């Protein structure tokens, strides 16, 4: 298997400790840039008009363990039952607000929760008809739900 980066994400977060636990926490959400490499600019055709995008990106080192203990919960949980960044395949996913282009190959986005310079793997339009599940449940996270999503 081979993954190819298509660009980089530019955020105000210089270290993992600077990153919010999720991109919905900072209010207001800081502006960020998804910079797409020139070889992939043609893939951005007709992206205008979408209010939200799904960004997939590479988070960095792989996990040592398949279980983690969330700081707000205190109970061990399987990594696949969490949104923890340390994973067997550290692929991150964010639904971001798309605020238009900031120049050729530069997308203005908000609600990212990754370190500046994170490799961008893919961009998909967020589609209300297929990406939102009105009846979705939150499993063990339900008691930790806040006004801005899971803790």
Regions found by a protein language model. Name each.
Residues 1-93, 100-151:
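Cys-His-centered catalytic/binding microenvironment captured across papain-like cysteine peptidases
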């Amino acid at each position: 298997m081979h993954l190819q980066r298509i660009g980089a994400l530019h955020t105000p977060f210089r270290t993992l400790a600077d990153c919010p636990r999720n991109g919905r926490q900072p209010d207001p959400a800081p502006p960020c840039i998804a910079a797409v490499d020139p070889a992939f600019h043609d893939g951005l055709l007709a992206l205008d008009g979408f209010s939200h995008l799904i960004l997939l990106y590479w988070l960095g080192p792989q996990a040592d363990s398949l279980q983690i203990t969330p700081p707000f919960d205190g109970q061990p949980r399987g990594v696949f039952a969490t949104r923890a960044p340390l994973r067997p395949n550290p692929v991150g996913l964010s639904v971001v607000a798309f605020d238009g282009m900031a120049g050729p190959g530069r997308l203005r986005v908000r609600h990212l929760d990754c370190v500046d310079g994170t490799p961008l793997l893919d961009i998909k339009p967020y589609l209300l008809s297929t990406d939102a599940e009105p009846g979705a449940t939150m499993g063990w996270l339900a008691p930790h739900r806040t006004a801005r999503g899971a803790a």
